[in-house]
Amino acid sequence: MATYLMFGRYTMEGLKGITAERSDKAAALLKKHGGELKAGYALLGKDDLLLIAEFPGTEQAMKASLALTKLTGITFLTSPAVTMAEFDKLAKDT
């Protein structure tokens, strides 16, 4: 499974629904799309939260990102990520 970083920004609508139950629903939604929530963090700065998730592929990650926005009112920027060891191997192979 591939790792994806999901940076979230609260909208006014999204701020109204902050609950532990919504967080549980979000994790279940990722699972419904073939993913697994590995970690979640609240942030200070231009982004308000970070979800680290694994998905089988880009299609599942994109669908989950869109579904999360519909569920929560939070906008997400979702990016694939590789470990530094994977990156070093890719760099060596070029």
Feature-to-residue mapping (PLM):
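Short, well-ordered beta-strand segments in beta-rich or mixed alpha/beta enzyme
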Residues: Y4-R9, Y41-A64
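An amphipathic, aromatic/His-enriched active-site/gating alpha helix that lines ligand/cofactor pockets
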Residues: P56-A85
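Generic structural signal for residues in well-ordered beta-strands
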Residues: L37-G40, F76-T78
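Short S/T/G/P-rich N-terminal loop/turn motif that feeds into the first structured element of a domain
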Residues: M1-K31, E36, L44-D47, V82-T94
